[in-house]
């Protein structure tokens, strides 16, 4: 919802002085677009991160944290909320080394007791005594949590693990890009190849040259492994019932009936 508001012709001139707080969450927001919002409307943004299995805010990024002098925070989901204990765990359910990415796991009074009538799923969700969120994250030096990506959205290409969120953040910084989703698609050589699906801002046209610019931007920022092998320009990206980019539906467009299980 915020992106169309930012792109509205009156976004920079309309009187929004009565709007004191704008909560956002549910899916990652482009740091570039968030910065654009703060520049236009001020520090009215407040982010909450959570999930249905722990139905309150696990972390929060306060309005004051949306500081234009500290742009790295715009990629963060904030610090843990009171009474919430978070840990970044590896596949062995042990804490990962400081500075590394791991699955965000939680212990707190707000955590569910389990899935009704689904003992196996409940056991898996609470492996090691923690609720596993399915999100991969890392902490920065100031204790702000950064969500790297959904664990199930990770792309394995040529034996390397690639997180789409990191690529999306680079591509969304391009002035022509309104929205982007990155998925893995079938590739005979690499198993999976990185594909970027892009919605352009009004006034910009799709071209091979623009696709090349986006690929080069990712290569320079993240490396050749992360650089998309292809870029598709589209009018819309499928959304879930909650309004999130539906990557399962997006992947299915490219995988079809192939053997790979679409998460």
Protein language model features and the residues they cover:
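Gly/Ser/Thr-rich phosphate-binding loop
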Residues: 6-72, 85, 92-95
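Glycine-centered tight turns that cap/initiate beta-strands
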Residues: 10, 18, 83, 176-179, ...
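Active-site glycine-centered loops adjacent to acidic/histidine catalytic or metal-binding residues
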Residues: 26, 50, 78, 135, ...
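Beta-strand->loop->alpha-helix junctions that form or flank phosphate-binding loops
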Residues: 46-55, 78-80, 183-186, 232
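Conserved ATP/PPi-binding loop(s) of AMP-dependent carboxylate-activating enzymes
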Residues: 79-83, 92-124, 162
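Flexible lysine-rich "adenylation lid" loop at the C-terminal edge of ANL adenylation domains
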Residues: 93, 234-254
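AMP-binding/adenylate-forming catalytic core of the ANL superfamily
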Residues: 108, 113-114, 121-124, 136-226, ...
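Acidic/polar alpha-helix N-cap and adjacent early helical turns
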Residues: 252-263
């Amino acid at each position: 919802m915020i992106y169309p508001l930012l792109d509205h012709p009156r976004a920079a001139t309309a009187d929004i002085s009565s709007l004191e707080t704008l909560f956002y969450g549910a899916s990652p927001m482009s740091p570039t677009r968030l910065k654009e919002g703060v520049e236009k409307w001020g520090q009215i943004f407040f982010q909450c991160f959570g999930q249905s299995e722990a139905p309150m805010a696990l972390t929060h990024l306060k309005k004051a944290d949306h500081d234009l002098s500290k742009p790295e925070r715009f990629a963060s989901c904030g610090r843990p909320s009171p009474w919430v204990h978070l840990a970044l765990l590896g596949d062995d359910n042990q804490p990962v080394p400081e500075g590394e990415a791991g699955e965000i796991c939680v212990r707190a009074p707000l955590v569910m007791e389990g899935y009704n009538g689904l003992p196996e799923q409940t056991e898996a969700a609470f492996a090691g005594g923690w609720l596993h969120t399915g999100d991969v994250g890392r902490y920065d030096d100031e204790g702000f949590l950064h969500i790297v990506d959904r664990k199930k959205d990770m792309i394995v290409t040529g034996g390397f693990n690639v997180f789409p969120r990191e690529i999306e953040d680079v591509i969304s910084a391009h002035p022509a890009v309104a929205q982007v989703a990155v998925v893995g698609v079938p590739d005979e050589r690499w198993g999976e190849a990185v594909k970027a699906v892009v919605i352009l801002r009004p006034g910009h046209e799709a071209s091979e040259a623009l696709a090349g610019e986006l690929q080069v931007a990712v290569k320079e920022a993240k490396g050749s492994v992360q650089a998309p092998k292809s870029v598709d320009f589209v009018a819309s990206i499928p959304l879930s019932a909650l309004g999130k980019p539906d990557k399962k539906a997006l992947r299915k467009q490219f995988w079809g009936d192939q053997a790979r299980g679409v998460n």
